[in-house]
Amino acid sequence: ILKMFAGESFLVDYNSTPMFALSALKKNKIKYKHISCPISSLKVIKNSIEQKNFKEVHKFDGLAFIKFWSWFEQLDKNNMFDEEYHAKKLFEYRSVNKLFKSNSFPTISAFGKNGSVIHYRYSKGKSKKIKSNNLYLIDSGGQYLNGTTDVTRVLIHGQPTNDMKTKYLSLIHISEPTRRLV
């Protein structure tokens, strides 16, 4: 099919064009020029209703997360729950809001070393028990009628070690320049 376009020239956005498509264009000696897709930049611009909903949904979700965090901090160190229970507890706090429909993606609820596994998912009925003095990662989001959230936090029940503090601060320093780009 591409041979039909020999001698033609195409505009492609390197940020959204799959490598397979670019390779096919090169292989068939079809000329192309890079442009930034104008649609992508227009999606970033939000109207007043979208801006209002964005603020509102993050207030709802933030309140649910604060309640979850407060619950987490008040747990007795001898009576902690597992990763699955914690994910369900956050869902419970979000569910109080009548605009909440579901999680926006499966919650990553990871304790200790599990927090370093990319897109970790606890096994139903086999999730790790949360204990004091270790890091707990929760990456979750809510799907509300007026918007979607995505929140990642690292919590600890008890005291972090000096090593944890050093590594965590190093990560923040590394990611800070990237955050400013957004």
Residue ranges and their predicted role:
Residues 173-182:
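Single conserved hydrophobic/aromatic residue that forms the stacking wall/gate
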Residues 1-100, 112-114, 155-169, 179:
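Flexible, acidic/His-enriched mid-domain "rim/lid" segments that flank
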Residues 123-129, 153-160:
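A glycine- and small-aliphatic-rich helix-loop capping segment at beta-alpha/alpha-beta transitions
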Residues 116-146:
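Acidic/histidine-enriched ion/cofactor-binding microenvironments in catalytic or ligand-binding pockets
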Residues 108, 114-117:
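Conserved beta-strand/loop block within the catalytic cores
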Residues 54, 109, 133-138, 171:
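Buried hydrophobic positions in well-ordered alpha/beta secondary-structure cores of metabolic enzymes
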Residues 104-106:
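Internal maturation/activation junctions in enzymes
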